[in-house]
Amino acid sequence: MKDIIEVRGLSLTIGKTAILNDVTVSLEAGKIHGLIGRNGSGKTMLMKCICGFIRPTRGVVVVDGKRVGKDVDFPKNMGIIIETPGFIPYYSGYKNLKLLAGLRNKIGKEEIIQAMERTGLDPKLKRHVKKYSLGMRQRLGLAQAIMEDPDILILDEPMNGLDKDGVEDMRRYLID
């Protein structure tokens, strides 16, 4: 299989602090890859560079043959879960996803409902997101990431706040 993500010579400096230094990695399509490192080692910053949220000081990121920051600002075939997903607190989970789907014209009601159900959330639940547990917000973050059926999922601390059943559901979903 081909490489879906290529990072070549990537460095990131913020102020006078070197966050990443000459990182080179290739990730093959169709496989699960992981970043392991100590707190503060730059894992999240590397993911943000891959996603196009942060421009590296040096180096190249290529996602599915397109250079991030040159050919494309944000790879369209990518779903992302950040460590602490942010949602509009006074909207329901469904309404939050509907709002995001409206920004990406090709996502309809069925895709939203399916994504919520696949992550163990009830699309009919009217509760505001501010009343969701941390685990429910993580599930909603996963639903947001998968509602477009992306080719690539970037997951930053996806198990954060999930109970034992939630962790097992997340693992099962990711393996399937």
What are these regions (language model features)?
Residues 98, 109-124:
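Conserved ABC ATPase "signature" region
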Residues 5-7, 20:
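Conserved structural motif at the start of ABC-family nucleotide-binding domains
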Residues 51:
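Helix-to-loop junction immediately C-terminal to a conserved catalytic motif
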Residues 153-157:
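Catalytic Walker B motif of ABC-type/P-loop ATPase nucleotide-binding domains
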Residues 36-38:
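The feature captures the beta-strand-to-loop junction immediately N-terminal to the Walker
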Residues 59-74:
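Conserved ABC transporter NBD signature motif
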